[in-house]
Design a protein with these regions (language model features):
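Hydrophobic beta-strand signal
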Residues: 150, 171, 285-288
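Short beta-strand/turn micro-motifs composed of small residues
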Residues: 3-4, 118, 291, 331
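C-terminal accessory regions
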Residues: 185-331
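Conserved helicase motor core of P-loop NTPases
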Residues: 6-166, 173-227
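Substrate-engagement module of ASCE P-loop NTPases
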Residues: 1, 5, 25-30, 315-320
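Structural recognition of the conserved hydrophobic beta-strand(s) that form the central parallel beta-sheet
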Residues: 1-4, 37-38, 329
Length: 331
């Protein structure tokens, strides 16, 4: 098992009787003959002030203390002569830093130059829209050439070959608007992998900006899922998953009550901002972290509440340790 036990477990077991299961690791990883534990950060060079922050976070997690928050209140910025380190920014200055980083030539030449990281999907949705439409000026359509995407699951073609791979980054290579035979409005696109430059086969993404189109999509997927749920044919689930693999979505979709209100998770999304969980395993030169979104959450009544301290520190540890050079935090 290769893992850092102070970060977010890759796989957790679900127990409906327990409220806090974010740190309950699957027995798949704990009941093994050989285990390897990561205890040293290896992304940053010696002398990077980030390393001291990581040490404080690790100590807090081990000892149940909260020294990290006091430290960043007293040390708003620590940067070495190479420009490596961390900076705590207010809301206005953080926004300007995001604009500066994502509009720079460094980002256009190197997609791993910077990434924005937060905890909730809503926050990531806000920042993806802000960066794409406000910074990069791509508001003319839902998908345009050179848009950046991150895959949220691996999708296969009918021959079991992967079209897109979970967590990989892509750039839109070609795009055209298309009305499918079933009447659904889609974007037919090919993507260029940011990893190896290979171009994917063409595939379809549902136009979710069109509410009528999404209603039609909902009617279809609910009907197909209900047949799979209640039917007896051996191929019923194959037809459902084949429909999903042909019609990809950029937004989560909730099935109706007849289908037990199950959530159909999105397949792909803009990749300028990603969640802490999605970032795990990735490496970027710089990260912009919405620390407010990690420390606090909002109840359905609109009340702002502190997140579980240990959970927040684990999320923050993952987000900050993605950077090889500099972390900018909004607080």
């Amino acid at each position: 098992m290769f893992t850092d036990e102070l970060q977010i477990p890759y796989v957790v077991t679900k127990n409906k009787d327990e409220k806090d299961n974010y740190n309950r690791i699957s027995p798949t990883f704990t009941h093994t003959d050989h285990q390897f534990r990561l205890t040293q950060i290896i992304r940053q060079e010696v002398g990077n002030p980030l390393l001291e922050l990581f040490g404080i976070i690790r100590s807090d997690l081990i000892n149940g203390t909260q020294n990290f928050y006091q430290y960043i209140i007293n040390h708003r910025e620590e940067v070495n002569t190479a420009g490596e380190g961390f900076t705590i920014l207010n809301k206005f200055d953080f926004r300007n830093k995001v604009i500066e980083m994502f509009s720079s030539d460094n980002f256009s030449r190197n997609l791993n130059y910077v990434r924005l990281i937060a905890f909730t999907n809503d926050c990531i949705g806000f920042w993806n829209t802000f960066i794409r439409d406000g910074v990069l000026n791509n508001p003319q359509g839902m998908i345009t050439k050179d848009d950046m995407f991150t895959a949220y699951r691996t999708v296969f073609d009918e021959y079991k070959s992967p079209i897109i791979i979970n967590s990989e980054d892509y750039i839109v290579h070609d795009v055209r608007y298309y009305i499918a035979d079933n009447g659904l409005a889609c974007y037919c696109i090919t993507l260029r992998s940011a990893f190896d430059g290979k171009v994917t086969p063409m595939f379809k993404i549902i136009d979710f900006w069109d509410s009528t189109n999404m209603n039609n999509f909902g009617t279809m997927i609910n009907a197909i899922h209900y047949k799979a749920l209640t039917g007896t044919e051996r191929s019923r689930w194959y037809r459902y998953f084949r429909f999903k693999d042909i019609h990809l979505t950029m937004t989560d979709f909730r099935l109706n009550s007849a289908n037990k209100n199950r959530l159909v998770a999105k397949d792909i999304d803009y990749g300028y901002g990603i969640t802490c969980h999605k970032s795990q395993g990735s490496t970027f030169e710089n990260v912009c972290i919405d620390l407010d979104d990690i420390i606090y959450f909002q109840t359905k009544w609109g009340k702002r509440i502190r997140r579980n301290p240990a959970e927040a520190l684990r999320l923050l540890y993952v987000a900050m340790s993605r950077a090889t050079k500099h972390a900018y935090l909004k607080l």
